[in-house]
Every structure is written in structure tokens, then in C-alpha cells.
From Swiss-Prot:
Coiled coil, from the record: none
Highest taxon listed in the record's lineage: Eukaryota
Record-level GO cellular component terms: glutamyl-tRNA(Gln) amidotransferase complex; mitochondrion
Annotated catalytic residues: K72 (charge relay system), S149 (charge relay system), S173 (acyl-ester intermediate)
Top EC category: ligase
Species the sequence originates in: Fusarium vanettenii (strain ATCC MYA-4622 / CBS 123669 / FGSC 9596 / NRRL 45880 / 77-13-4)
GO biological process, one term: glutaminyl-tRNAGln biosynthesis via transamidation
Protein name: Glutamyl-tRNA(Gln) amidotransferase subunit A, mitochondrial
Length: 511
């Protein structure tokens, strides 16, 4: 199918409107050892002085190569406080180090600092932080969003202060900042990279990922050093070794010639709110892949329209449980109230320690889990999440290695529907779509937006998060704009290596 046909069917006339919204994560750290880089118009907080090789007691692997690493401030490090950009964890020292940080130290990482973010990862613009908003370095004379919640990590990479940066992606918190800052953002398959030592926002969605200026450093770090093979017994969501072997056996590790690949163009991602320049970049990228031999196939992912709504029920529900521990007794900076009255102590501590967006999501999540709302909201959102997973499984050529093909649920389709329509043609190897519907907004514009408007930034990133799929955002040049467009490659579960390899080819084609 030619690019012209795909353009006519999928891109030219937007037929879909957004019925859902969402947000992300980003955080910094502070203390007397840190300094804000105001000269560069951002608030990523970095270590003042030499890079920290410590954890220097950690033995290096034989294949270790030195590189500079920035770490998002919700990932525990032994040498820096872990504050999640929150007053309630101000100057909190971590008693241990995250598994992924240790793994990267073994591979030669020197930590240059912790990066600013949205408080506890709740936000899409890295503005909900006790350290101030992160600013986009692509707009030197303007205050523009760097995306969230891993905005500080993206900026550290963009400015060259770090070769690789760690972030977390719950609903797009790595990919959105990558799109806004012109960097590469990779969200691995859920369960591939250890979450031990990551301050949780939503356990079933949180995924540790990577940002860099190019795809290759990420690919080499994850696959050439065998990071993707390492199970962590300390993390109950880390995929077991037996499951990793099964996934590896069913998933190719090399990318064939593009003439043998089918690239899916999802119709539902062509929404009315999509900026025309980003739509043009999407079309140009699809055409570039077709010119190299790939076949473009329009596909339908009908549950996309409900994905954002489901995310903003499920993620806050999990957050309300995860953040209950911050009460001034077990964790968190204690409020000023009397210790004798428990209710006052808790309310004073949480009222003063949490920011407005965190409070909003705690309240939303608590309500979703209440007896009056559980069936109508939380359970329904779980059903939508399963439908999103089924949509992806139906269009990918590879079967999901976590499920037996016979387990595919067709009960929600009409009896008269033919089997070929139920399963779909299974003809797509990868999906190509925008990362964000718009270019980064100014910070003063964000202040005037409603929470729902802010959540809408994640409409293209949330579906892959709900399904636990690998996704990579790469920048595409846009004529007449100082900002690139973020384009996203999504693959079947555990097809991460080929997703990265295709993303590398895509980045070269649209540079």
C-alpha cells in the first residue's frame, strides 16, 4: 500500500476526537552539594564537582565502558538524596541503591547527578516540583515545557551533561520529554528492567527506561551488555528467568530488510487535536520507510479512545495506596502539628508535604477504590486495559509471548463477525505514530490549562503503557519550527531489540 493511500485513509482528514486525558513524571534533587543550572534555563540539579564513580566499591565488568549517567530523582542512589521533587522527602537519604543504578555502575557509569521531575512522577511538564519548573533548552529565550515527568533527564542529555539518563515511564514520562527536547526516549517492555529502588507511583505501569541523544547507546547498553537478560529477585514485577527465555525464543533479535516489514499506521491516532506540522512529519516518516521497501498498512486500535480515561483511573488508584506510607511517622518530613493526635499529625504532614497535583490524584484514586465507585470506575478501567492489550495483540504479526494464542478472548465481538475480522490479518510488525499531539507549550500557557487539558498530552503514549509494550520516541525535523516532532515506534511485547533497531533507521531517515 502506497504512502499516498495511507495518507488518504489515515492522515488527511482527522475523524477521531479525544475522549480521554493523562499526565507523567519528572523530579530533581537538592541539598548543599547541588546547584541549579539557571544559565541554561533549566532546573536539573547536578552534582557540583567531579562525577561520582562511587559505589566505586562495585566491581566493573570486563566489557565496562565509561559514560556519564544522570538519574531521575525517584530512583534511589547511595551518593545522592532521593526526594522525588517533593517537600515530604526533602533531603531524604536512601539506605540502598536501585538495582538498575548498580547494574549501570558495573557497566562503567559515573553518576553526574539527579534530575528534576514532576513530584512523584505526577505531571506532563516537569512543573510540579519543589525545585521549580524544568525549561526546554531548545527555546533559549523563552520559558517552554521540557515535558514530564522525566524532563530533567531529557534536558541533561540534550545539553550534553549526560551521555545516558535514567527515567521512569508510567504513561509516557520518558517519551514525551524526549519528543519535546529532540532526544531519544525508550520505554522497555514491562518487567524487563528492575524496578527495585524506584519510588513507586503506579506499580503495574511504572517502567524504568533510558534517554540519550542517539538510539545506539541505549541499544548497546541494554542488549550488547545483556542487561535485558538480568532478573532481579528483589523486584516482584521483574520477569522470571524462565519467562525471559521463552520470550527470547519466540522473538527475533535481528531486523530483516525493510522490504519484509509491515508498518502499521493507526487510524485512531489521527485526532482533530493533532498539530498539522506533526501530522506532516508523520506522513513524511511513513513515506521514508516505504521508500526503503517497507509496506504501510492502515490499522485500527479502537480502544485507544478510552485508554486515557482508563489510565487516569488506574494510576491514581495505585498512587493513593503507594503514597499512604508518607505520614510523618514511618516516612516523610513530619508536619508541625502535635504528635499526640494522630489525625492532626497525618493531615498536617501530608497537607504540607504534598503538592496540589499529588493531592488531586490521591483524592481521585481513593474515590476510585471506594465501595461506591469500585465497580463503575476501577473495574471498568481494568476491562478497558485488557481491551487495549487485545487491540495490540490482534494487529501484531508476532504473538504476545506471555499468552498462549488460544487464550485470545473473542467474546466481546458479535457472533456474526468472521474469524479473519476478529483476529485481524496479523500483518503488522511495528506501529508508527506521533509521540505527542502538539509541540511543547509555554509554561505560562500550562498554568491556564485545566488538569484535563494537561492530561491530553499523553493520549498517544498511554496505550503502549497500559499494554506493557516497548516504545521508542525519536525526533523528526520540522521545517520552520525550532522544535522537532516526536515519532514513536511501538512493537510487540519483548520485541524491544527490533524496536530500537527500527527506531535507529527511522531517526536516520527523518533527521
Amino acid at each position: 500500500m502506497s504512502a499516498a493511500v495511507v495518507r488518504r485513509l489515515a492522515l488527511n482528514s482527522p475523524r477521531h476526537t479525544i475522549i480521554s486525558r493523562r499526565a507523567v513524571h519528572l523530579q530533581p534533587l537538592c541539598g548543599q552539594q547541588y546547584v541549579k543550572s539557571k544559565l541554561r534555563n533549566w532546573t536539573c540539579l547536578t552534582f557540583l564537582g567531579e562525577s561520582v564513580t562511587a559505589g566505586s566499591s562495585i566491581p566493573l565488568r570486563k566489557d565496562a565502558k565509561p559514560f556519564k549517567l544522570a538519574v531521575k530523582d525517584n530512583i534511589a542512589t547511595a551518593d545522592f538524596p532521593t526526594q522525588c521533587a517533593s517537600q515530604i522527602l526533602s533531603s531524604h537519604p536512601s539506605p540502598f541503591e536501585a538495582t538498575v543504578v548498580r547494574q549501570l555502575r558495573e557497566r562503567g557509569a559515573s553518576i553526574v547527578g539527579k534530575t528534576n521531575m514532576d513530584e512523584f512522577g505526577m505531571g506532563s511538564h516537569s512543573t510540579n516540583s519543589i525545585h521549580g519548573a524544568v525549561r526546554n533548552p531548545l527555546a533559549e529565550d523563552d520559558d517552554v515545557s521540557a515535558g514530564g515527568s522525566s524532563g530533567g533527564s531529557a534536558v541533561a542529555v540534550r545539553l550534553g551533561d549526560a551521555d545516558v539518563a535514567l527515567g521512569t515511564d508510567t504513561g509516557g514520562s520518558i517519551r514525551l520529554p524526549a519528543a519535546y527536547t529532540g532526544t531519544v526516549g525508550y520505554k522497555p517492555s514491562y518487567g524487563m528492567i528492575s524496578r527495585f529502588g524506584v519510588v513507586p507511583y503506579a506499580n503495574s505501569l511504572d517502567t524504568v527506561g533510558f534517554l540519550a541523544s542517539e538510539v545506539k547507546p541505549i541499544h548497546d547498553l541494554v542488549f550488547k551488555t545483556g542487561l535485558y537478560q538480568e532478573h532481579d529477585s528483589s523486584d516482584p514485577t521483574s520477569l522470571p528467568i524462565a519467562s525471559r527465555k521463552r520470550c527470547a525464543e519466540t522473538t527475533p533479535s535481528t531486523l530483516p530488510d525493510l522490504s519484509k516489514l509491515n508498518i502499521g499506521i493507526p487510524l485512531e491516532y489521527n485526532i482533530e487535536e493533532l498539530d498539522p506540522s506533526i501530522r506532516d512529519a508523520w506522513v513524511a516518516a511513513a513515506s521514508a520507510l516505504e521508500a526503503q521497501g517497507a509496506t504501510l498498512v492502515p490499522i485500527s486500535l479502537p480502544s485507544t479512545t478510552e485508554a486515557l480515561c482508563a489510565y487516569y483511573v488506574l494510576a491514581p488508584a495505585e498512587a493513593s495506596s503507594n503514597l499512604a506510607k508518607y505520614d510523618g511517622v514511618r516516612y516523610g518530613k513530619r508536619g508541625e502539628g502535635s504528635d499526640a493526635v494522630g489525625e492532626t499529625l497525618y493531615s498536617d504532614t501530608r497537607g504540607a508535604g504534598f503538592g496540589d497535583e499529588v493531592k488531586r490524584r490521591i483524592l481521585l484514586g481513593t474515590y476510585s477504590l471506594s465501595s461506591e465507585a469500585m465497580d463503575n470506575y476501577f473495574i471498568q478501567a481494568q476491562k478497558v486495559r485488557r481491551m487495549v492489550q487485545q487491540d495490540f495483540d490482534r494487529v501484531f504479526r508476532l504473538d504476545n509471548p506471555l499468552y498462549e494464542p488460544a487464550q485470545f478472548d473473542l467474546s466481546d465481538m458479535a457472533e456474526a463477525t468472521g474469524m479473519e475480522d476478529k483476529r485481524g490479518p496479523l500483518q503488522v510488525d511495528f506501529i508508527l505514530c506521533p509521540t505527542a499531539p502538539t509541540f511543547p507549550p509555554r509554561l505560562d500557557e500550562i498554568k491556564e490549562q485545566s488538569s484535563v487539558d494537561v492530561y491530553m498530552n499523553d493520549v498517544f503514549t498511554v496505550p503502549a503503557s497500559l499494554a506493557g509494550l516497548p516504545a521508542v520516541s525519536v525526533p523528526a525535523k520540522v521545517e520552520g519550527s525550532r522544535f522537532p516532532a516526536g515519532l514513536q515506534v511501538i512493537g510487540q511485547y519483548w520485541d524491544d531489540q527490533r524496536v530500537l533497531l527500527l527506531a535507529e533507521k527511522l531517526k536516520e531517515a527523518v533527521a
